[in-house]
């Protein structure tokens, strides 16, 4: 391509200033002669450090630099980097090493060309193209920046129009990316008229860590949406920094933030699964959605209820009992058709830590016109279970559960005082109404599916804690003046039925019960039976009287299976000999099958022969048990999640374990007696099972 003349008539590249750096003096001399033949103004230097000093002293003194790759004082690539950062001049590398990786390294470091020694004259004649290309791009950049400055002067200063600067910045950034590609292109282009050496040169801006931090601080001060290059430049106040530099850096910064946001948005959070779409309707006449909308149920409680009813385990349901209205379930009353099952949920209502003490609220208002709950007295519950159960139930996840409130019914008022309860897995402990003289100084220890229901106004006094294991049920019957065990009382498939007032008969076999479910707690005045032998079912408990000392006598060879016990006066011997037929004694203790953890203290109303087993408490009016032969029912062993807990007449306390039982009709209280003297009604005494 022919040389171009400028406006003054001087041919280009005549007089182009070239700096040659090489540690070989012979090579320097040859190159200088060849450059002079090309009519260039050549300057030679044998040290890279010296050449760098010359460039720093006179940045405008040279148009292009030719440097060797391998030099003793400084590597040619290092010199290339420093010149590109500080002076922004085109640099041509030369070396006898023609390996591709070395040539590629020079190109990556920003070299305009790579000459292989020995350098030919034709190559030196065309080095002026790199100077023209460099200055041509700088002229276009300068013109573009001038148009942006004019736009800034004519643009209104309101906030809405400030966003237009960002669009211009984007256009400028795309233009600069195209410019960088053209810099690497070795093809010749059309040259414009004019002297390129007369145009101004702008140094390249290096965004160091400190400079970038100032930029970020300015953007944060203005806000990412309101940050524009002009304001950022004013806040940074860095000499030599132009608005174009800030605009380009701002565009890159916004693209970076956008990529980060998209990356985080695409990652699903494994700790926050999507909320369940299931809805909780009404249960027992209680609309959970309405309660949640009115603020009576916390949202987290409603979510936990949804998970529970959908069959998913939940361990975080917390319903505080002091400052918020508690969740209540309506009493399940009336007859149930065959096959209709109780709906119960029993995930943790109040979750506590092991061995924690919690005070129960004294009262709580009713919700939605439903029967309210009577609160437990403000006494402390001591936990001594290794699994960390609290207050009664242990679910499949071994969660700690406290029954905050129990339902208040006329027949089962919760007003007793329990000082200490040691509750084992799957146990429900419920005091009965008017528990005047029921006192446990050391606490009761129900264990494994135990339902402990003291009688109403029974005058029940316990000085030492009994141990009730393997699913026993301790209960008494409805108030009656005298119960003469003269006839066979047979019960079949009855659940939660009150006992009859009184029955009289001959000296027959006594009470018979097999597989009872629930014996309601209603209080008792006296029990009296003759000295006839009695039958005790395999799942029963009995109270013995007038028997030889330390033994349980059954004259009719009635089998006494496991899970039984007797109420008596004083501490019994703690061995298996108590269950054999021996001589006579009148005082018995409450026994379990496996071991005895406590005993009953001597009672003041026991005579020397055991005709009267009186239970009384000083300073209170109480009744007494006269004679024994009283069968006490036992819950059937149905495994976890099978047992009902009932208080009073048909009142159901929902629990985790009331899921699969079928409730029998509870209103038909027929008391008909067959020809054989047996009571034929299946709904007497609250026993469940078949003869």
Swiss-Prot record:
Example GO biological process: phosphorelay signal transduction system
Localization (cell): Nucleus
Disordered: annotated span: 139-204, 616-647
Comp. bias intervals (Low complexity): 616-628
Sequence similarity: Belongs to the ARR family. Type-B subfamily.
Cited function: Transcriptional activator that binds specific DNA sequence. Functions as a response regulator involved in His-to-Asp phosphorelay signal transduction system. Phosphorylation of the Asp residue in the receiver domain activates the ability of the protein to promote the transcription of target genes. May directly activate some type-A response regulators in response to cytokinins.
Protein name: Two-component response regulator ORR21
Organism: Oryza sativa subsp. indica
């Amino acid at each position: 391509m022919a040389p171009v003349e400028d406006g003054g008539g001087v041919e280009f590249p005549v007089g182009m200033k070239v700096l040659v750096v090489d540690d070989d003096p012979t090579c320097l001399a040859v190159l200088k002669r060849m450059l002079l033949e090309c009519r260039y103004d050549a300057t030679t230097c044998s040290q890279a450090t010296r050449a760098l000093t010359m460039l720093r002293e006179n940045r405008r003194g040279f148009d292009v630099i030719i440097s060797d790759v391998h030099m003793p004082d400084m590597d040619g690539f290092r010199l290339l980097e420093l010149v590109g950062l500080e002076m922004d001049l085109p640099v041509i590398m030369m070396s006898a090493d023609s390996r591709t990786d070395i040539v590629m390294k020079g190109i990556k470091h920003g070299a305009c060309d790579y000459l292989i020694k020995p350098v030919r004259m034709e190559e030196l004649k065309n080095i002026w193209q790199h100077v023209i290309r460099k200055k041509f791009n700088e002229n276009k950049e300068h013109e573009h920046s001038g148009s942006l400055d004019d736009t800034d002067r004519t643009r209104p200063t309101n906030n809405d129009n400030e966003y237009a600067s960002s669009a211009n910045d984007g256009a400028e950034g795309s233009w600069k990316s195209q410019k960088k590609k053209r810099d690497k292109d070795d093809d010749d282009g059309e040259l414009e008229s004019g002297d390129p050496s007369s145009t101004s040169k702008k140094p390249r801006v290096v965004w160091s860590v400190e400079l970038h931090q100032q930029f970020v601080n300015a953007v944060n001060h203005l806000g990412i949406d309101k940050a524009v290059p002009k304001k950022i430049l004013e806040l940074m106040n860095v000499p030599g920094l132009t608005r174009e530099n800030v605009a380009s850096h701002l565009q890159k910064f916004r693209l970076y933030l956008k990529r980060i946001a998209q990356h985080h948005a695409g990652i699903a959070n494994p700790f926050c699964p999507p909320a369940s779409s299931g809805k909780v309707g009404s249960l027992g006449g209680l609309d959970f959605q309405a309660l949640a909308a009115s603020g009576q149920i916390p949202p987290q409680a409603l979510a936990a209820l949804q998970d529970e009813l959908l069959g998913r385990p939940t361990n975080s349901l917390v319903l505080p009992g002091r400052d918020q209205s508690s969740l209540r379930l309506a009493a399940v009353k009336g007859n149930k058709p065959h096959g209709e099952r109780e709906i119960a949920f029993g995930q943790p209502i109040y979750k506590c830590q092991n061995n924690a003490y919690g005070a129960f609220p004294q009262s709580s208002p009713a919700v939605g016109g439903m029967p309210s709950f009577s609160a437990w007295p403000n006494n402390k519950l001591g936990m001594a279970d290794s699994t960390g159960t609290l207050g009664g139930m242990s679910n499949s996840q071994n969660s700690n559960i406290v029954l905050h409130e129990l339902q208040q019914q006329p027949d089962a008022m919760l007003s007793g005082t329990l000082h200490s309860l040691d509750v084992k897995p799957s146990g429900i402990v419920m005091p009965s109404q008017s528990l005047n003289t029921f006192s446990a100084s050391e606490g009761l220890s129900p264990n494994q599916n135990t339902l402990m229901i003291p009688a109403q106004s029974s005058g029940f006094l316990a000085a030492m804690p009994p141990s009730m294991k393997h699913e026993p049920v301790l209960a008494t019957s409805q108030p009656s003046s005298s119960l003469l065990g003269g006839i066979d009382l047979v019960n079949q498939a009855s659940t939660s039925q009150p006992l009859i007032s009184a029955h009289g008969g001959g000296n027959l076999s006594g009470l018979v019960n097999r597989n009872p479910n629930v014996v309601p707690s209603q209080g008792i005045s006296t029990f009296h039976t003759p000295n006839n032998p009695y039958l005790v079912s395999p799942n029963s408990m009995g109270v013995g009287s007038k028997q030889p000392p330390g033994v349980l006598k059954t004259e009719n060879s009635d089998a006494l299976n496991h899970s039984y016990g007797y109420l008596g006066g004083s501490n019994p011997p703690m061995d298996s000999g108590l269950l054999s037929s021996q001589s006579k004694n009148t005082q018995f203790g409450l026994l379990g099958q496996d071991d005895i953890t406590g005993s009953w203290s001597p009672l003041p109303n026991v005579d020397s022969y055991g005709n009267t087993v009186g239970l009384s408490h000083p300073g209170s009016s109480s009744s007494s048990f006269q004679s024994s032969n009283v069968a006490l029912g036992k819950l059937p062993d149905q495994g976890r999640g099978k047992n009902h807990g009932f208080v009073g007449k048909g009142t159901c306390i929902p629990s985790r374990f009331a899921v699969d039982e079928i409730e029998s009709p509870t209103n038909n209280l027929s008391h008909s007696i067959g020809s054989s003297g047996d009571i034929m009604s299946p709904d007497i005494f609250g026993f469940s099972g078949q003869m």
